[in-house]
């Protein structure tokens, strides 16, 4: 290929599904003859939401919810055409967001 590196960035709310997706990508790339760097764990985004439990008063009674977004980075160095075809056909778990940069 003309490009020497494919960068894959994965995001998910559950780290187990994210790790299985990263494991599938790494296994597919190494099986087809490409060099893989990663998966590199990136910082986890933590969103915290605070709401009042009561509808009208009792402001001291609050409840907090948090949402964590886990991220991984996988670099595929010197990919072949066979590697790209295998990655396009790869079936990843639902709930994993994939961003690919060539």
Curated annotation (Swiss-Prot):
Query: What transmembrane ranges does the database entry give?
Result: none
Q: Does the keyword Mitochondrion apply?
A: no
| MF-aspect GO terms | structural constituent of ribosome; tRNA binding
The protein's superkingdom reads Bacteria
InterPro entries, sorted: Ribosomal_uS10, Ribosomal_uS10_CS, Ribosomal_uS10_dom, Ribosomal_uS10_dom_sf
* Gene3D superfamilies, A to Z: Ribosomal protein S10 domain
An annotated GO BP: translation
Kindly state one GO CC term assigned in the UniProt record.
Answer: ribonucleoprotein complex
- What PROSITE patterns is this protein classified in? RIBOSOMAL_S10
Which keywords belong to this entry? Ribonucleoprotein, Ribosomal protein
**HAMAP family (UniProt xref):** Ribosomal_uS10 (MF_00508)
Function description:
Involved in the binding of tRNA to the ribosomes.
Q: Which family does it belong to?
A: Belongs to the universal ribosomal protein uS10 family.
- What quaternary arrangement does the UniProt entry report? Part of the 30S ribosomal subunit.
Protein's UniProt name: Small ribosomal subunit protein uS10
Q: Give the source species.
A: Streptococcus pyogenes serotype M1
């Amino acid at each position: 290929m003309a490009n020497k590196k494919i960068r894959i960035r994965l995001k998910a709310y559950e780290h187990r599904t994210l790790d299985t997706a990263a494991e599938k990508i790494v296994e597919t790339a190494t099986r087809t003859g490409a060099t893989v760097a990663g998966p590199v764990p990136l910082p986890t985004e933590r969103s915290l939401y605070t709401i009042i439990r009561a509808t009208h008063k009792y402001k001291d009674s609050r409840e907090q919810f948090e949402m964590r977004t886990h991220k991984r980075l996988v670099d595929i160095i010197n990919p072949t055409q066979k590697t790209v075809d295998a990655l396009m056909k790869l079936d990843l778990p639902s709930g994993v967001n994939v961003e690919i940069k060539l």
